[in-house]
């Protein structure tokens, strides 16, 4: 997907994964496609709050890095990425192991309300800031509850009259009413 977009002139992409060790796999896979492996660059190479100075490439980071908030004069990692990509970005954002963003919308637990996860909220902030981005959710782990799918707003399941459900709350209600078969 990234290579297809690259060949169409969209020369910036973001790859978010659970572990920084997976960058070696990402570089190997990118190289196997005939591309320069060093074009896959870790966000950790750039200090938080400083500009990302890549003209093009695949920015690799972890969910733990993505959730880094503003710190004094240093902007959040989400803002740093958006500044690099530009608000009109229409390239690819890969959420590898996307289930790591589960509980992005919070919900109800056995002991009451459950706060939204920081990783999930950061993933949603990135998606909201880049409405034209081509978002890919990759996960072999199924959601255990419908609330855990709040991060996956780009699936087109809720969001207005052009979607099956007007809101995420309507989607959650319908799936919960349908039971296990609906999941």
Residue ranges and their predicted role:
Residues 1-122, 162-176:
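SF2 helicase/translocase NTPase motor core
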Residues 12, 37, 133-134, 156:
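Secondary-structure boundary/capping positions in well-ordered alpha/beta enzyme cores
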Residues 22, 144, 158:
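Flexible, glycine-rich phosphate/dinucleotide-binding loops
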Residues 27, 150-153:
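Short, amphipathic alpha-helical segments that act as regulatory/interfacial helices
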Residues 99, 126-150, 163-164:
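Conserved helicase ATPase motor motifs in RecA-like P-loop NTPase domains
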Residues 152-158, 174:
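Conserved AAA+ ATPase "sensor/coupling" helix adjacent to the nucleotide-binding pocket
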Residues 178-183:
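Conserved AAA+ ATPase small/helical "lid" subdomain
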């Amino acid at each position: 997907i990234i290579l297809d977009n690259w060949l169409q002139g969209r020369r910036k992409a973001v790859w978010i994964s659970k572990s920084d060790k997976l960058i070696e796999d990402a570089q190997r896979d990118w190289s196997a496609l005939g591309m320069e492996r060093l074009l896959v660059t870790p966000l950790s190479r750039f200090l938080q709050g400083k500009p990302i100075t890549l003209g093009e490439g695949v920015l690799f980071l972890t969910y733990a890095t993505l959730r880094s908030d503003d710190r004094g004069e240093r902007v959040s990692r989400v803002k740093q990425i958006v500044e690099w990509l530009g608000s009109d970005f229409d390239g690819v954002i890969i959420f590898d192991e996307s289930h790591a963003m589960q509980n992005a919308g919070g919900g109800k637990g056995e002991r009451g309300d459950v706060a939204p996860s920081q990783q999930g909220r950061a993933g949603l902030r990135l998606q909201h800031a880049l409405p034209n981005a081509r978002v890919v959710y990759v996960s072999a782990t199924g959601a255990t509850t419908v609330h855990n799918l709040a991060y996956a707003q780009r699936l087109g399941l809720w969001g207005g009259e052009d979607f099956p459900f007007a809101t995420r709350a309507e989607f959650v209600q319908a799936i919960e009413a349908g039971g296990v078969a609906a999941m």
